[in-house]
A protein has these predicted regions:
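MFS transmembrane alpha-helix packing/gate-lining sites
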Residues: 75, 104-111, 161, 193-197
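Helix-loop-helix hairpins in multi-pass membrane proteins, especially solute transporters
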Residues: 120-259
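Conserved kink/hinge residues within transmembrane alpha-helices of Major Facilitator Superfamily
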Residues: 80, 105, 109-116, 201-202
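Extracytoplasmic
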Residues: 57-103, 111, 165-166, 170
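Cytosolic juxtamembrane N-terminal segment immediately preceding the first transmembrane helix
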Residues: 2-74, 88
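Phenylalanine-glycine-rich, low-complexity intrinsically disordered regions
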Residues: 260, 265-276
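Residue-level signature of the transmembrane alpha-helical core
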Residues: 63-66, 70, 102, 106, ...
Length: 276
């Protein structure tokens, strides 16, 4: 009787232990399957931080970035070709003849690092719109300059706006234009806008200077830059919203190495001054 009871207990316990072993084996197999899954399947589930723009809107964004680069360089071409007329009109001394051109490149080169850092923190669209708006204002101010000191100062301020525009435009194209040929075309068009604008500035600046004067060339560039600013308001992708409790000003104070930026900018200013 005791043997029969022991056999009964043995047969009833055996399936339980077998099912536990099979359960642990299946869990191990599932874990191994997850570990052996391709990386593409894992990364495909990760959310994208920036949305890719539709083709039509991406084209407008690229045109806006290219246009801002074009008209900034256009003004440099106008300055070069119209410099004798500008000198006679504004009474620019011989010792300051190079400064309407050099002041622009001096400030543009020295402020690029700072502008890129600010764009990363404050948002590319916000920084781009600020730069494009003040670019139009300072281009117009160059056309309205009454003496040599004013046009040099306005050209220097225009260089700062170009430094603000460039890294933000690059960031927008990098993050929101489809990777591959569309993005490559965006960078190519933006880079091509600089020499193309300078060439057009030389040609059209000479035509303006010989006919109606050099000032209207800046008026045309200012109106076009203002139009590109308005285009940017409607077409540039929205910046990511900051997390709760994080203001833009606080992030600017904490996330940017202001001492490093100041030292780097000072070095670039001195280098540009020597080369100028």
């Amino acid at each position: 009787m005791a043997r029969h009871a022991a056999a009964h207990v043995h047969t009833s316990v055996a399936p339980t232990s077998t099912s536990g072993a099979s359960s642990s084996s299946s869990n191990s197999n599932e874990t191994l399957a997850e570990l052996e899954a391709p990386a593409c399947e894992t990364t495909a589930l990760l959310p994208k931080s920036h949305a890719v723009l539709p083709t039509s809107r991406a084209v407008v964004v690229i045109v806006q970035a290219c246009g801002l680069s074009f008209f900034s360089s256009f003004c440099s071409g106008v300055i070069v070709i119209a410099l004798p007329a500008i000198q006679s009109t504004l009474g620019l001394p011989e010792s300051l003849l190079v400064w309407p051109t050099s002041s622009y490149y001096l400030t543009a080169g020295s402020c690029l690092l700072l502008a890129g850092s600010v764009a990363d923190v404050a948002g590319s669209k916000r920084v781009n719109l600020i730069g494009s708006f003040f670019s139009a204002i300072f281009i117009l101010a160059c056309g309205l300059a009454r003496n040599g000191a004013e046009i040099i100062a306005f050209r220097a301020l225009h260089g700062i706006t170009y430094a603000i525009i460039t890294p933000s435009s690059i960031s927008i194209i990098s993050n929101n234009v489809e990777e591959g040929r569309p993005r490559n075309m965006g960078f190519a068009c933006m880079g091509f806008g600089q020499p193309l604008g300078f060439c057009f500035g030389l040609v059209l600046g000479g035509m303006f200077t010989d006919t109606v004067g050099w000032r209207p060339a800046f008026y045309v560039a200012a109106v076009a830059s203002l139009a590109l600013f308005l285009v940017g308001i409607w077409t540039l992708p929205q910046d990511a919203r900051p997390q709760a409790g994080q203001s833009v000003w606080k992030r600017l104070a904490l996330e940017i190495d202001w001492i490093g930026v100041l030292l780097a900018s000072t070095g670039l200013i001195l280098l540009s001054y020597v080369l100028a």
